[in-house]
Amino acid sequence: MMQDLRLILIIVGAIAIIALLVHGFWTSRKERSSMFRDRPLKRMKSKRDDDSYDEDVEDDEGVGEVRVHRVNHAPANAQEHEAARPSPQHQYQPPYASAQPRQPVQQPPEAQVPPQHAPHPAQPVQQPAYQPQPEQPLQQPVSPQVAPAPQPVHSAPQPAQQAFQPAEPVAAPQPEPVAEPAPVMDKPKRKEAVIIMNVAAHHGSELNGELLLNSIQQAGFIFGDMNIYHRHLSPDGSGPALFSLANMVKPGTFDPEMKDFTTPGVTIFMQVPSYGDELQNFKLMLQSAQHIADEVGGVVLDDQRRMMTPQKLREYQDIIREVKDANA
């Protein structure tokens, strides 16, 4: 008995479970079929809502085109008016229609009313898809108020910012005046000069008087005027003096007795122009200075008491030529 009851319960439970499964499967299939059936309407609604949203965006960005609606006067018989009212027709707009520029709606010219500026722009009326437009109560005819035409404001004509201007003739570039070089004034030539050279002892020493006297006499100098030595045209002291020799220490004079005499050096000088050939006299003067320097152990210096150089010798020769040309 217990086994039969258990078997019955098992069978009843299995039937109940199968019934629940069948019912659930049937319910889900029904909901899915209804969802697929309503999807085209939802798509059309969503597309229409998108178009309405685009129109709202355009209205928000700026005041759109003013639309003029013709006001129909209510007839005496309302039933005839309702009967003559055409049924609204709904046109389906494809999804890509919103991307195309909207064409302005042309109204009949005879019923145009001057635009009235409302404080708030009228919002476009959204019409649901596939639903008839509800009937609106008849409006009382409103007499159109003609707004005064705005008077044109005559502003003073302003000249164009960039008016055409005739091109001015471009003047040909004038050559810059070339400053004439100032006439070079010829440096006046020397008509006389003094050529100087020195024979000096080495630094920190002095020339011995006895050695100096012997070297001076060997070079052909003779003690004479102004208590100095002179080199004449002839070695015996005859003829005009060619160049002279003086003491480097002021007053530049000598004592013929030079045994106990010392000096840092002597100065040899020649005045140009002089007797004879000045260039030959200069060579003789240079040879005499070198001979005395060799005998007393000294050195030959220029007029600035610097070491004699070949450049300085050429400078002396140029001075002599210049003086000769000036006195030619």
Swiss-Prot record:
Induction: Repressed 1.5-fold by hydroxyurea. Residues 1-6 are periplasmic. GO terms for biological process: cell division; division septum assembly; FtsZ-dependent cytokinesis. It is found in: Cell inner membrane. Residues 42-186 are annotated as: Disordered. Keywords: Cell cycle, Cell division, Cell inner membrane, Cell membrane, Membrane, Transmembrane, Transmembrane helix. The keyword Cell division applies. GO terms for cellular component: cell division site; divisome complex; plasma membrane. It holds the Pfam family ZipA_C. The keyword Transmembrane applies. Residues 51-63 have a biased composition (Acidic residues). Belongs to the ZipA family. Contains an N-terminal transmembrane domain, followed by a charged domain, an unstructured P/Q domain rich in proline and glutamine, and a C-terminal FtsZ-binding domain. Essential cell division protein that stabilizes the FtsZ protofilaments by cross-linking them and that serves as a cytoplasmic membrane anchor for the Z ring. Also required for the recruitment to the septal ring of the downstream cell division proteins FtsK, FtsQ, FtsL and FtsN. ZipA overproduction protects FtsZ from degradation by ClpP by preventing recognition by ClpX. Does not affect the GTPase activity of FtsZ. Has been isolated as a 91 kDa complex containing ZipA-EptA and an unidentified 24 kDa protein, but it was shown later that there is no physical interaction between ZipA and EptA. This is Cell division protein ZipA. It comes from Escherichia coli (strain K12). The lineage of its organism: Bacteria, Pseudomonadati, Pseudomonadota, Gammaproteobacteria, Enterobacterales.
